[in-house]
């Protein structure tokens, strides 16, 4: 605000993005590609980008394409598995690959910093779970997106696929696995930085780290019609105000409190349930080098999606690593570097009953979390040895993973725990927030396209934006789920541009 009471032009932006994680970074990249003239401001309360859930050691799963994550294909009462969610997630990840390929082709994105190939494997070792995996394989392999999936119960082949899982295993124990060679590991922290740094250097994006959103309110004109959003920031130089016609809340677990503060009625339907996580991290680089795959097992009954056990090859800050977990825990924080008061301060008259209803109807989840909290180091090591029989405790250390805030949504049937992510937007599209967790980052491009469709509908329909979007995403307008030829064309293009094999 200037001395004469008018608002300074340098404090007004076309969009304010809150949270310097993968979601805001993806939206910033898309908006800049569609209109390089937009003034964008990104605000982050920490001192750098991607330090919460987007960080590779915080993210519960990387490179999600539903190739190996068994929780996306639950068993149904009729003995078949549900495949719709897996197909949708796979299509979403293909969209991300398509976008990254376009940016790399333009020389705007170095994919070597965040994208690495690693086979995706599902492995199980009880008769019941083998029957489940076989049913999953038979159904998915009939779908074009998963046609390259391979099945094996042959020990020599399984040892080649996942040597650490098979070494030292009882020869009498039945083991089965499926494998997709064209899998990836994605360091979303590195990708976030790869998006943001060139935008910041060119002046296309203003970034303020160490800056917290204190308040967010809608301004009104003299005729009482709604105008810009007024965002109050607290940063190193004190408190200041910025304004924008559009605000995106992409602050991970911190999005819900900000959404509630905005006052939009759509926020009343939501509450959050935080789940924390722990990893066992291998400290032996030679051991980690023996595996180049993500090996997923089957989650325990009642376990949340982020707790599907896996022995996971990851590249963290350019270094190849091996992790096992995650083990679930509970903290009332909504962010890893949040406050213990996050959960209680999010309770409102509109969401208290749904929260209580979810607690009463998800006893298995509550019991699972209690059991996880009680786990001793020896019990965690026992869980690791189920995957890796030769694992030695001295080679592994415990590391705290990121926080996830699962959605609790009010409905006519009462409160329900909603897995996955959801875009919540004001009726006029001037504000949007992303709530929820898995698969999240891997489908960020698809999710941010939904934000554009709901909040920039008129501009997206313009010839200029339409032409630019078509150039970025050549398959846009088509449906790779229903059109195998389109899916094949997308994959051939992405594989060529991103150097993917299989």
Swiss-Prot record:
Pathway: Carbohydrate metabolism; tricarboxylic acid cycle; oxaloacetate from (S)-malate (quinone route): step 1/1. One of its GO terms (biological process) is tricarboxylic acid cycle. It catalyses: (S)-malate + a quinone = a quinol + oxaloacetate. Its EC number is 1.1.5.4. Coiled coil: none annotated. Keywords: FAD, Flavoprotein, Oxidoreductase, Tricarboxylic acid cycle. Its cofactor is FAD. InterPro entries: FAD/NAD-bd_sf, MQO. One of its GO terms (molecular function) is L-malate dehydrogenase (quinone) activity. It is an enzyme of class 1 (oxidoreductase). The keyword Transcription does not apply. The keyword Oxidoreductase applies. Belongs to the MQO family. This is Probable malate:quinone oxidoreductase. It comes from Parasynechococcus marenigrum (strain WH8102).
């Amino acid at each position: 605000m200037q001395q004469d009471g008018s608002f300074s032009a340098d404090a007004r932006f076309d969009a304010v993005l809150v949270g310097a994680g993968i979601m805001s970074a993806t939206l910033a990249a898309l908006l800049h590609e569609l209109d390089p003239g937009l003034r964008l401001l990104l605000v982050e309360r920490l001192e750098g980008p991607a330090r919460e859930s987007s960080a590779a050691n915080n993210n519960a799963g990387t490179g999600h394409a539903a190739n190996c994550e068994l929780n996306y294909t639950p068993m149904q009462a009729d003995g078949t598995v549900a495949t719709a969610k897996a197909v949708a997630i796979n299509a979403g990840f293909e969209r991300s690959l398509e976008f990254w390929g376009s940016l790399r082709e333009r020389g705007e994105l170095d994919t070597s910093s965040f994208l690495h190939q690693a086979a995706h494997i599902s492995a199980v070792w009880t008769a019941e779970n083998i029957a489940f995996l076989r049913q999953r394989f038979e159904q998915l392999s009939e779908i074009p997106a998963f046609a390259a999936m391979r099945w094996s119960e042959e020990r020599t082949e399984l040892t080649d696929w996942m040597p650490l899982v098979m070494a030292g295993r009882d020869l009498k124990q039945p083991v089965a696995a499926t494998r997709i060679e064209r899998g990836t590991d994605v360091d979303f922290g590195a990708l976030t930085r790869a998006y943001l740094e060139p935008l910041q250097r060119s002046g296309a994006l203003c970034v303020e780290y160490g800056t917290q959103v204190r308040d967010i309110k809608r301004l009104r004109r003299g005729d009482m019609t709604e105008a810009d959003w007024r965002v109050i920031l607290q940063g190193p130089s004190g408190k200041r105000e910025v304004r924008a016609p559009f605000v995106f809340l992409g602050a991970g677990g911190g999005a819900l409190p900000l959404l509630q503060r905005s006052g939009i009625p759509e926020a009343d339907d939501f509450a959050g349930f935080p789940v924390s996580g722990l990893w066992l991290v291998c400290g032996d680089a030679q051991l980690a080098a023996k595996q180049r795959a993500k090996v997923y097992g089957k989650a325990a009954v009642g376990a949340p999606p982020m707790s599907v056990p896996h022995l996971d090859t990851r590249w963290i800050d350019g270094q190849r690593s091996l992790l096992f977990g995650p083990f679930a825990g509970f903290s009332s924080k909504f962010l890893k570097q949040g406050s213990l008061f996050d959960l209680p301060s999010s309770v409102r008259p509109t969401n208290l009953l749904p929260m209580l209803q979810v607690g009463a109807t998800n006893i298995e989840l509550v019991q699972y979390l209690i059991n996880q909290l009680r786990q001793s180091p020896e019990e965690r090591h026992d869980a690791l040895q189920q995957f890796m029989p030769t694992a030695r405790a001295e080679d592994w250390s415990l590391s705290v993973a990121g926080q996830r805030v699962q959605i609790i949504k009010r409905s006519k049937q009462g409160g329900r725990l909603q897995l996955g992510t959801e875009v919540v937007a004001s009726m006029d599209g001037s504000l949007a927030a992303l709530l929820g967790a898995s698969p999240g980052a891997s489908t960020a491009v698809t999710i941010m396209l939904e934000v554009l469709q709901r909040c920039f509908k008129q501009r997206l329909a313009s010839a200029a934006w339409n032409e630019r979007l078509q150039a970025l995403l050549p398959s846009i307008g088509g449906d790779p789920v229903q059109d195998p030829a389109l899916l094949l064309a997308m994959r051939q293009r992405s594989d060529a541009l991103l150097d993917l094999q299989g």
